[in-house]
Amino acid sequence: MGGCQAEIGVSSSMAAAALTESLGGTQRQALMAAEIAMEHHLGMTCDPIGGLVQVPCIERNTMGAIKAITASQLALQSSPDYARVSLDKVIKTMWDTAKDMNFKYKETAEGGLALHIPLGLKEC
């Protein structure tokens, strides 16, 4: 239903929380890290070229990992007392965004990069 925003956003969120806990962060800092990571995947299209989970999927997952590390570092250096956005609100927003997105941007290979990159590429 949510495509890449959900797949990569949720995995990045979980990784950010786990890393924060592993580095000695509090539970509230872990929630903050999860929120930060997920928030920055909202609205991401899911447009695999040729319907294959290669391009741009591999790079997007790599960027999700980097976002998880960055989110963890931000949360560890911040106080959850000052957070304006909660993980619950971001999860709700992701659900609403997924429902609002056009179907062709949800892993159909009918929009975005899938539409504009030729299938004849050897790399694909």
Residues covered by each model-derived region:
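Cysteine-centered functional microenvironments
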Residues: 1-4
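Functionally critical mobile loop/hinge segments
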Residues: 8-124
